[in-house]
């Protein structure tokens, strides 16, 4: 085979793979996702009554008001474009001091010790869920701030607790955004 033929073969193969992998494959799977899973393919967006996007059920948000359940801390301040962990080792003094400060602030605001998920950052920095126990330790504060019966808030937490995927994978969890939106929907 001459060098010119080899170059021609290389150019054709490059074009075939570029069209196949760069165009056909993404278009086919994007089309499939739009048909089979339209909500997830578009970011699992959460909208308010005016159809405005207020978040995603897959990305955590920072809630600081006493009227809301608080999610996990974020090492990236909930900025999705910077998603990732802090990479601090469990023995790192900066991490230990941050966790101690977060735990003290939580205890001052809630009158009880936090669960571990409420003071440790998730790997992505964007986890939208907390554990049911993490929600339970915040129930008294939220019910007091909203002037609701604690049992009413506990019932709502239970209603928004998601089980394990397929009954065996992962742990039970509570989506903080969904729970807080449900709280806003309560009429007294």
UniProtKB/Swiss-Prot annotation:
GO terms for biological process: potassium ion transmembrane transport. It is found in: Cell inner membrane. One of its GO terms (cellular component) is plasma membrane. GO terms for molecular function: ATP binding; P-type potassium transmembrane transporter activity. Keywords: ATP-binding, Cell inner membrane, Cell membrane, Ion transport, Membrane, Nucleotide-binding, Potassium, Potassium transport, Transmembrane, Transmembrane helix, Transport. The keyword Nucleotide-binding applies. The chain crosses the membrane at residues 13-33. InterPro entries: KdpC. Its main location: membrane. It is a single-pass membrane protein. The system is composed of three essential subunits: KdpA, KdpB and KdpC. Belongs to the KdpC family. Part of the high-affinity ATP-driven potassium transport (or Kdp) system, which catalyzes the hydrolysis of ATP coupled with the electrogenic transport of potassium into the cytoplasm. This subunit acts as a catalytic chaperone that increases the ATP-binding affinity of the ATP-hydrolyzing subunit KdpB by the formation of a transient KdpB/KdpC/ATP ternary complex. HAMAP family: KdpC. This is Potassium-transporting ATPase KdpC subunit. The lineage of its organism: Bacteria, Bacillati, Cyanobacteriota, Cyanophyceae, Gloeobacterales.
């Amino acid at each position: 085979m001459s060098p010119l033929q080899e170059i021609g073969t290389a150019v054709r193969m490059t074009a075939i793979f570029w069209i196949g992998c760069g165009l056909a494959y993404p278009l086919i799977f994007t089309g499939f996702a739009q048909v089979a899973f339209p909500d997830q393919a578009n970011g699992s967006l959460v909208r308010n009554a005016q159809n405005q996007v207020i978040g995603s059920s897959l990305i955590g948000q920072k809630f600081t008001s006493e009227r809301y359940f608080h999610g996990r801390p974020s090492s990236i301040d909930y900025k999705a474009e910077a998603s990732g962990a802090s990479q601090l080792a469990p023995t790192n003094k900066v991490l230990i001091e941050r966790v101690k400060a977060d735990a003290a602030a939580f205890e001052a605001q809630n009158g009880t010790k936090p669960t571990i998920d409420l003071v440790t950052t998730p790997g992505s920095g964007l986890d939208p869920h907390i554990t049911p126990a993490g929600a339970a330790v915040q129930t008294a504060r939220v019910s007091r701030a909203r002037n609701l019966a604690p049992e009413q808030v506990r019932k709502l937490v239970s209603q928004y607790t998601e089980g394990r995927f397929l009954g065996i994978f992962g742990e039970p969890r509570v989506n903080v955004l969904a729970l807080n939106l449900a709280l806003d929907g309560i009429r007294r």
